[in-house]
């Protein structure tokens, strides 16, 4: 699961989630089960490996998954689903298709009347869901509309596949903390829109590795006009090498203070719009 999550594959459908983020269950037998090869459809023999795997999986659902939903999710009537579209775009169409699959499965968990062990726990109806593509600051604002169009297409297909109804679903490209600023760079007769920030140590573009200290102007590339392009496995980079779009991770900005010593809030992108959609009606 950890290998599948790395940038090379950037997969998103990676349950059980606690295997990647064990928290207080780190080292617990509750996280020591695995799928087995196809076996005959009969009850496992007592004391067998199959019986132990089945018992631990059922215990995981009972003691880890259900309490999480019962204590947290079931009390919500608004939900925000954060997706790392940038990482998936870096990895290509297969990662984008898997991201769509993950969003579908998430929405299916919120679908009323589905009749599985999760949705039977719901006592409240979720009436607004925001699908938010994070790290919008890794793109120039000229590409934000295209990013939102990609996420809209992904969300619409996920809603249809999950047969999800009864809630308003919106999308937004945002950055809770803006780690870059924008600028332009002359390249011959062409003026390129760039983002300026400090890439994390070890991030790479075209063979160059960043040291985590140097501020750099980066042209991440343009997202395609046609949304379906990023989901089409037949589309590759023109020369078969690095992709036409490439994003790196940036260090957060330094906190700034006024002359009076007051610490300023961190900059963001569209966090206000996200809050307006999720809770604006409660504040009117």
Spell out what each predicted region is.
Residues 174-177, 181-191:
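Long, contiguous domain-sized segments
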Residues 96-97, 145-151, 186-192:
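Short secondary-structure boundary/capping segments
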Residues 169, 192-198, 212:
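Class I S-adenosyl-L-methionine
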Residues 1-124, 140, 158-159, 175-179, ...:
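Switch- and interface-adjacent substructures of P-loop NTPase systems
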Residues 138-163:
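GTPase G-domain guanine-specificity segment
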Residues 92, 142-144, 182-186:
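Short conserved micro-motifs at the rims of enzyme active sites and ligand-binding pockets
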Residues 78-80, 124-135, 160-173:
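Conserved beta-strand/loop subsegment of P-loop NTPase cores
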């Amino acid at each position: 699961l950890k290998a599948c999550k790395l940038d090379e594959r950037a997969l998103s459908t990676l349950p059980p989630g606690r295997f990647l983020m064990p928290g207080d269950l780190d080292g617990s037998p509750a996280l020591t089960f695995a799928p087995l090869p196809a076996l005959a459809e009969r009850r496992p023999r007592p004391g067998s490996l199959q019986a132990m795997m089945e018992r631990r999986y059922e215990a995981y659902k009972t003691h880890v998954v259900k309490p999480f939903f019962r204590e947290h999710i079931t009390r919500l009537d608004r939900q925000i689903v954060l997706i790392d579209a940038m990482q998936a775009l870096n990895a290509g169409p297969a990662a984008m298709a898997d991201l769509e699959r993950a969003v579908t499965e998430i929405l299916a968990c919120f679908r009323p009347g589905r009749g599985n062990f999760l949705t039977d726990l719901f006592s409240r109806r979720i009436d607004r869901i925001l699908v938010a593509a994070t790290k919008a600051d890794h793109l120039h604002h000229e590409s934000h509309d295209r990013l939102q169009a990609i996420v809209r297409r992904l969300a619409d297909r996920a809603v249809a596949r999950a047969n999800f109804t009864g809630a308003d679903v919106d999308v937004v490209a945002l950055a809770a903390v803006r780690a870059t600023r924008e600028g332009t760079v002359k390249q011959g007769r062409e003026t390129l829109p760039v983002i300026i920030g400090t890439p994390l140590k070890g991030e790479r573009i075209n063979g160059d590795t960043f040291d985590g200290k140097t501020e750099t102007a980066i042209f991440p590339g343009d997202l395609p006009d046609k949304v379906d392009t990023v989901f089409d496995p037949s589309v590759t980079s023109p020369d078969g090498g690095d992709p036409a779009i490439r994003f790196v991770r940036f260090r957060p900005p330094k906190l700034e203070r006024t002359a009076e010593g007051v610490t300023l809030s961190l900059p963001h992108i569209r966090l206000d719009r996200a809050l307006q959609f999720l809770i604006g009606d409660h504040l009117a």
